[in-house]
Amino acid sequence: MLSPSKTVGEFTLIRHFQNILKSQAIPRGAIGIGDDASVYPQGKHASWLMTHDMLLAGIHFLPPQGRGWWELGWKALAVNLSDIAAMGGRPSQALVGLGLPDKLSPSGLQNFYRGLKACAKK
């Protein structure tokens, strides 16, 4: 059980969710929630690896100014690609989830996607 008076870290949360979800039916051969990625077999010789890391302003990065959005776009994809690589996978697709500040300029958003695209091409 989680204590409301205590700061909960990433790995404590993962273990907590694993305990809650352990009664869920997991497809044969699948590896559920963990630190890097979940594994879902797709036939005899292939699997899907799924991951999603969220970056929080003030924790994982300082709020960007100007070109900093490009670097943040790069980092947002790179942290997820590294999870796929850690599992021995090769990335083919990405899902982007954004929580944006009210005052984000259109050029900031463009720079974010340019950084993300540059990382994807690498």
Predicted segment positions?
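Extreme N-terminal cap/leader segments of soluble proteins
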Residues: 1-68, 87, 96, 114, ...
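A glycine-rich phosphate/pyrophosphate-binding beta-strand-loop-alpha-helix module
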Residues: 68-122
